[in-house]
Amino acid sequence: MADLFAILVVAILVVFSFDFFNGFHDAANAIATIVATKVLTPTKAVAMAAAGNFVGMVFITNAIAETIGKGIIDTNVLGVNALPLSDAALFHSLAIIMGGVVGAIAWDIITWLWGLPTSSSHALIGGLIGASALAAGTGSILLPSTTNMLLFLFVTGMAFVLGAASYFAYDVIIRRHRPTLGMTILAGLLTGLLPAVILGKILLKGLVQIVVYMVAAPLVGLAFAFGLALVVIRLFRRHTPTKVNHEFKRLQLVSSFFYSVTHGTNDAQKGMGIITLILVVAAIGPPWGPPSGQFAVPFWVILGAHASISLGTFFGGWRIVRTMSQRVTHLRPWQGFSAETGGGIALASSALAGIPVSTTHVIASAIMGVGATKRLSAVRWGVARRIFWAWIITIPASAGVGMAAYAIMRLAFGV
């Protein structure tokens, strides 16, 4: 059986590598809009985004790290209820955790090579679910009760129907237009958004809660960006386009940095949660680990995770920047400001609530929301559909890769 200390060191380095790939793959989204508006060159934008990711560690909350560490799979599968573990049990627990992380990294690399703006966050969740399900069955995946699930579906479903029907009636009776199916569905989704966000936090948990917020977070980003863009249009309607662009070029520097900070605090916490879980399972206490019985992230883990994601941002992601900034919609500085501010608000809210969401989804939807203020045809929906299908397959595909990675880890660890 392999040396325990060496395995722990390698496991922690692998998680930091995940954060690096997260930055390489996901954090480019933070600069997509500021590159599209030509406020900054790609090189300067990447440097600013990397700095913002690192500054994200001052956002004092570890709620997402706790959700990742103990809110997706049953930690009893990892032996948390029977510490300290024997070497064999510890190696098996590490095989599950590392299977999930390695599966997520593999999926990140695959989608980066394809140029798809998929989600590292959901790849990690899928990898953990796949590894845990293969190791201990689907019962190891945390799910809400049937009663809570049905209540959630009933309330949000009624809100969706009410919103869609109201929009349909408004378009037919008041505007005397023929309503489009897409806008009718979108109206229903936006109406159901508030009850979904509130009830999702109260009634749901585990995988179902994450899937709900996987849909809700982009809609929040879209709604905030769309609304903010409409406010900007209203306030600056008497100004010349040249003056508006000049003013918002400076403001977009602030909004882009704000988005980078919220991205850093949101995404770095995924790696922080995994490393803290490793320390808990290995029964490593202070100063390197959390106190017994607590899920407290050590400062060195916070520092290392943010440094890793910042370095990843600095070194890559250009193909995805091109997809996000040039092929979704064309942007002006005021639109970039609206998209980044709306997306940043959505990410900051999710960080405070402890909900792991996809920064990729949020900024893509925010860009589409801003583009839709001009006209729906201004958004290149073909690219949006491609991104949408990439979202849909991320969790199941990365779960499959996580299963394979777990099997390989068991062989490597000799358990």
Summary of predicted features, one role per range:
Residues 1-415:
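Multi-pass alpha-helical transmembrane bundle typical of ion/small-solute transporters
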